[in-house]
Amino acid sequence: MSIDKKIKFFRKRRGMTQRELGTEVGFPPTSADVRIAQYENGSRTPKRYVLNVIADVLVVSPLALTVPEIEDDLVLLHTLFALEDHYGLKLSIDGATMYANLIISAKRDTPLYPKLYFWQVMRRRLATGEITKEEYDDWKYGLS
C-alpha cells in the first residue's frame, strides 16, 4: 500500500476527517483538508517531518506509513529476495500451492528476539480473545 493510501487508511481507522487530521497536523484550518486530500490522492508527498507529525496524530509508527508497497508483484518479489538474502526465506511447492517459509533464528541475546517473542504473545492473546483485532492492530501499527 502506498503512502497516500496508508494515510487515508489510518485516518479512516481513527474516524477522522481530512480537515480534522490536517488541523491537528498544524495546517491552517482553511487549507487543512486540501493538504491532506493532496497527500491522499498522491498529488503531493509529505516531507519526512510532516509524515512524522501525521503518524503522531494518527497514533501509528512512521514506519507503518512507509512500509514497502507490496501490492506490486515485482516490489513484493524483491522484498522476498531481501528476506531470502538476510533471513533465509525458503520456497516450497505442494501441488498447486507455493509456500514461503521464513524461520528467523533470533537468539535470546539479540535485539530482534524480544520483539518477535512479544509479537507471538500478542498473536496468542488475539487468538484466545484476550484482546480484540483493533487492540492488536493498535499495538502492531504503533511499533517504532
Regions found by a protein language model. Name each.
Residues 7, 18-22, 33-39, 54, ...:
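Conserved hydrophobic/aromatic packing and binding residues within compact polymer-binding modules
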Residues 45, 49-127:
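Charged, helix-prone or intrinsically disordered regulatory segments positioned adjacent to compact structured domains
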Residues 1-14:
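A short, Lys/Arg-rich alpha-helix, primarily the initiator
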Residues 26-46, 67-71:
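Recognition helix of helix-turn-helix/homeodomain-like DNA-binding domains
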Residues 128-139, 144:
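Short, compact, well-ordered microdomains
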Residues 12, 23, 27, 56:
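Alpha-helical residues within the helix-turn-helix
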